[in-house]
Structures are given as structure tokens and as C-alpha cells.
Amino acid sequence: LMIAGRQYLTTPSNPLPIELAEITLKEYSDLLSDSVKVYEFIYYERRIKEIKMNVDAFFDAKRHYTTLYERSFREAINYDYKEEAYVEFNRCLINFIASFKSFVEHCEIRVKSIFGSTSDEVLEFKSYLSNLFDNKFSYRFFIKLRDYAIHVGYPIENVLFSKYTFNPAGTDCWYEVQTFGSKNKLSSSNTFNSRIRGEIVNQEEPFDISLYIFEVYDLIINVFRKFLSVASREFIEPANRFITLSEIHNQEDLSVTISKIENGRINFHSKLLPIALAKKIIANC
């Protein structure tokens, strides 16, 4: 029987939670603190989802306009879909770059807020990002492409619609939509440093910017994993504590409960512990 004014580890149940063990006030507070840290993971998970949605939007647009282009050989398309495609591809690309760039910056700021701006953890995370910028053209190009989009213009200069025929009868056709950047315009912009301008010049023609999107997305997933590793005490350690607690009590659903006397009766206030989310964090590391 749970006693008023004490704290318990419980399993959720109606009408009353089921007591597993009495815990101290410090243990109760620590579990609530760990819960806050683990639930913060949802924010970062959503940001990754946002980035992936922007990737998907770009390639969904490619499929959509490729289908429209193919249809145009069979029926009239009564609006300027090619002009719309130009705007849509640039919109999706800019959204993708903005979403991953702000995500990386937010991770960096969060590490500083946890450990302090002069900490070894901040140095480790900054070093990781610096190495990424130094060693991956796609990453440093897209980071600076955001500035280009803000200060100069659309990064995609030309959307090319192509039809390829593989037999004289023209019955076997392949349709393609490509998104090209202008090497001349990009390489002449002071938005990029001399190294990146030279690298743009050396890229193969035609310069299809979309070919870098998946590579950059994979790099951002690695940044996320590095962030979780560096900030392990905020995410991984609390998650592991919840998993251990779940294993000790052989329960997938755990809660903490405090009992209080209110208006002459005992009420039980419970908070569910994020066991499933803790397992997801560990799976992502």
C-alpha cells in the first residue's frame, strides 16, 4: 500500500498505479530529470525528420515534373509547369540546406550550453565539424550555397527536360529532369572562398547540384550521431539508466508516482518514464 507523501516506482494501471518499489525523493527527482533529457531527443529527431522531408520533397518534385513532361507528349498541359518546376526545385533545395545548416548550428550551441564554451566536448564537436568541412566538398559547398541563395540568387540556374529515344520508331523513350547550377556564376561569386570556387570550376559538366543531396544528408546523420556521442551524459547515459531499470523490473512500462493528501483523500500523481524512447536513442548511437 502506497503511503501519502512518499515516492514510488510504479507500473501504469487503472484506476491506480501498481507499486514496484519505494524510492527516495532524490531518486524520484533524478528520474524526472532523466526524463526531461531523454524527451529532449524528440526535438532533434523531429529536426532530422524535417531535413529528410526536404530531401523527399526535392525528389518527389523530380518525379512529378518528369511525369508531367512525359504526359506533355500525349496531351496538352495547360500551364507553364517548367517555370513552376524551376521555382519548386530551388525552393526545395534552399529549404533542405537551411534545415540542415540550422540543425548543425543548434547542435553546436547545445553542446556549448551543456559543457561550457571552452570545454573539451565543444572542442571535440567543433573539430569534427571542421574536419567535415575540410574533407567533404559536398558539405562545404552546400553550407556556402545557403549564403549564395541569400545574397546572390537561386542556386539552380537551369532545369533541363530531356527525352531520349532508343529506337527509330520512337516507342521506347526515357524522360529525365535535371537541375543544373551555373559553374560560371557560382565560381565567380565571392560567397565562396577561393578553394571552393576552384573546386566548382573543376566539377564535371553538366553540373547537376542534386547529385550531392543524398551525400550531404548522410553526413548530417553522422553529425547527429556525433552530437549524441559528445553529449552522452545528456542523452545516452539517462537512456541507459532507463533501459537498465526496465530490465531490473522486467517491465516495458514504468512510471514514477508520488502520493499526496488533497481535499481529504489520497491522490496519486504519476509520470510515465520514456523507456521506448530511451531504446530508440541507444539504437541511433
Outline where the language-model segments fall.
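Acidic, Ser/Thr/Gly/Pro-rich intrinsically disordered interaction regions
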Residues: 1-90, 121-285
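Flexible secondary-structure boundary motifs
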Residues: 88-134
